[in-house]
Amino acid sequence: MELLPFSDYAKKEMEAVSARLSQKPPHGLRFAFLTDLHYKFITEMRQSLSNIIHTLNALHETNAIDFLCLGGDNVGNYPNSREEHIAMMQELADLLKNAKMPVICVQGNHDDNSIHCAIENTHTCKTGFEVPDDIQHDILFTLASGCEHYHPAGNKALYGYLDIPHADTRVVFLNSSNVPYILDGDIMRYNQQWDFGYTGKQLDWLANTALKNAPKNVFFIEHSPFETKRTLSEPKENEDALNTITRAFANGESLHISRNHADFGYDIAADFRGKTHSIPARIGGHCHFDSCGIDPAGFFSITTMLGGRKNSGMHVGDDGVMYPRERYTETETSVDIFTFDPDEYTLISTRYGSGVDRNFKIQ
């Protein structure tokens, strides 16, 4: 599917971003993060996404962008139709194929469409409207299949990792909506709309595959924020295990953890002794506003403002400002372009669209 023409207002915004974008460091990592797009097939969103891709392609020509990450809630799921949800996902994928850099997706809580399965006034969901992981994988997550250093977990799991050799950095893409699909009659025991967490399978993959033989620096990206108090985000099953694994990895320690649970059980051993690692940041979306701070596990955590329409929900960020979001203007979206310099150990984000640039004080 061809992009719509590059809007004049978006060209001006791209030029302003290009002027502010620092020269990419010799060993630097640069990536774009577009979260909570809530895409649907209307002209307004086709234009906004076309402008985003035109912008990133133009910036990529002069200042290489290593990848574009869609941070979950990639599709809007506003029609209560499974077929329309899948069609929107396919159109989104077709537009993203115009990007000149690798595109990697993570899953958000709106992406399986289970919100339309909910029994009235409850968070209990019947089966019928949900879009399973394998369909999401085949449409959106295969966009990364041509990326040389991307390693999917396999078996159509919606997580993987990407190595950036020139930056001595790995980026781990987690699935924070990784709940098992179990039916109790016609009721889903867990639904991805309101239930968050990590199965034992994903945690074991993290400890013994994604973090095995890792380079010095490792970023984590998922949909749900890692910092839960400031963002008022929902609790996640096995979040404590995720944090235990991550701390042991960073500190160069061994671990053996287990949990006896029918659906979220695990028994994981890993040995990270002999080398410590740096985790510059753990990055998420979901809350629809910009934030940063130290998360409960002691790591630096960042969220990025939603990239979708105003009626998807705008909120005040850390600076107390409600930024504009107006269609067919330079504020129609928000995309962070992160630049990490491992030599100087600095991390900045340059904002395309609504919001401001940020200079993070990483540890």
Per-range role (PLM):
Residues 1-86:
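N-terminal active-site segment of His-dependent metallophosphoesterases
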Residues 9-15, 79-205, 251, 294-297, ...:
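Extended active-site neighborhood of metal-dependent phosphoesterases/phosphodiesterases
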Residues 27-30, 63-67, 98-104, 167-170, ...:
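Loop/turn elements at helix/coil->beta-strand transitions in domains of secreted/extracellular proteins
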Residues 28-41, 168-182, 221, 299-306, ...:
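Active-site-proximal beta-strand elements of phosphoester/diester hydrolases
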Residues 36, 68, 73, 108, ...:
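Divalent metal-coordination and catalytic microenvironments
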Residues 40-42, 76-79, 105-117, 179-184, ...:
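Active-site environment of divalent metal-dependent phosphoester hydrolases
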Residues 85, 178-203, 211-280:
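Active-site-proximal segments of metal-dependent phosphoesterases and phosphodiesterases across multiple
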Residues 234-341:
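Conserved beta-sheet core of the metallophosphoesterase superfamily
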